[in-house]
Amino acid sequence: MSDINVKFLSLSSGSSGNCYFLGRFDGENCLGGILIDAGVSLKRLKSILYDHGLSTDDFGAVLITHDHMDHVRSLASYCKKLSKPIWTSDVLADALLSRTLKLASLGATVLKLVEDGWNDV
């Protein structure tokens, strides 16, 4: 029987975007995990995950820690293209939805993208 380990990977950190992966591994095989923050483009995320032997199929949700742009920059894109649940606090969810409503009033279609991705924690 193999040992199951938990690994934390810093995929990107700094003002250019923050994104982390927390997962369970059996040796080199990922058994599932979560993505923490959405600060990098989906294209960049896929590339970084690939470099670590992972894909977007290896996480089941995205956890948002706070609403600084370097942590949420690509959240709408993740919601639209990945169809993963988004986990965050009620206060942060309200703040993100409030911003989204302002964008929607300008003709943006972000509201539906974020709304479709939310789950209660």
What do the PLM-derived regions correspond to, one by one?
Residues 1-52:
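Conserved beta-strand hairpin/beta-sheet module of binuclear metal-dependent hydrolase folds
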